[in-house]
Amino acid sequence: MATILQNLPIGQKVGIAFSGGLDTSAALHWMKLKGAIPYAYTANLGQPDEPDYEDIPRKAMQYGAEQARLIDCRSQLAAEGLAALQAGAFHITTAGVTYFNTTPLGRAVTGTMLVAAMKEDDVNIWGDGSTYKGNDIERFYRYGLLTNPSLKIYKPWLDQLFIDELGGRAEMSEFMTQAGFGYKMSAEKAYSTDSNMLGATHEAKDLEHLSSGMKIVNPIMGVAFWKDEVEVKREEVTVRFEEGRPVALNGVEYPDLVELILEANRIGGRHGLGMSDQIENRIIEAKSRGIYEAPGLALLFIAYERLVTGIHNEDTIEQYRDSGRRLGRLLYQGRWFDSQAIMLRETAQRWVASAITGEVTIELRRGNDYSILNTESANLTYQPERLSMEKVEGAFTPLDRIGQLTMRNLDIVDTRAKLGIYAKSGVLSLGTGGDLLNLTGKAAE
């Protein structure tokens, strides 16, 4: 039997990741009418734009679900978000502004926890709303099969019969209205939005055009800081970490990581912190564009990285960042629980994050404009007295530096010899002054 089912499995249990929106509502009711036995599963990821989670399973039952469950995924999402932060698992940046992989983190949690819940109900066929051109179809495929090796995939949006009968939002809205549900299609936005407690993604439609900028987006986790009429006051915030875990904001301790992240979102959101505009490579290698929000993670990451640079040495920081970029890409590809990803993140958690204890005070202004005002940690290896020109005990002397510089003569001689070889081969031309070294020939092209 194929893993991916192209036709509706009549008479069988089919689990659907149910959001309560038009697409999944129409799909669920359609599957019921066609003879399947739909089970609805909704993930509570702390979405900032979801007003009433409890109402979603009730809707699913009205539309024909045999059973509807609400799965609280917030604690697991917070834990995975912290692991990503500790490992610096963020590979998409533009001019130093970071995308915090919040959608891939949400998919890792949703794809495992919902399928685990389905397995409890003896539901071994899963459907969701991901499209065939996107990243999510592969992420959910991987996480689903990792959780339940017997899982089969049925997506209404890959079923030609469903597409023929309910191919667009207008058709879905009419279908639900005729069924007696009085479903009103919401006003069409200029872009689509997907969110969870860690961040929001805005993409597609008008945002596919690079001439449409961030200003067409209505933020859901913070303020539109680019608008002059939006008042944004300067604010100082102190973030405290203990052994790599954020534990306090402005002196208030948060034993519950979920509550700390929500408060960090509120603080960062008041300034529009963490918004970014990124061009990225999807899993299929086609480029896409997204506008992202992550006010809380951005705030925590500023403080975390400040402590990383003050506590660890250069080689450790280099390895942390190189490994973080590799791990970020694995996370993006839906491989967060693969062995190579676990190896990278647990190494960072054990040898980098465990030493991160201290407090960082930050002044937030508009958007990603901020200043670090103070850094305190008992673990700091930053010690200004080591570089003091005053006489201090334990400092190195001029004679020590003379010896160190003399040892550099060996590699300087080697470098000079290499440059001579390159000049003889025509790769370099030796001139004078500012033109001392110039690439020539093919190397300059």
Swiss-Prot record:
Spans through the membrane: none
Reaction(s) catalysed (UniProt annotation): L-citrulline + L-aspartate + ATP = 2-(N(omega)-L-arginino)succinate + AMP + diphosphate + H(+)
Record bears the keyword Repeat: no
MF (Gene Ontology): argininosuccinate synthase activity; ATP binding; protein homodimerization activity
Binding site for L-citrulline: Y99, N135, R139, S192, T201, E203, E280
EC supergroup of this enzyme: ligase
Annotated protein name in UniProt: Argininosuccinate synthase
Organism: Polaromonas naphthalenivorans (strain CJ2)
Lineage, top ranks: Bacteria, Pseudomonadati, Pseudomonadota, Betaproteobacteria, Burkholderiales
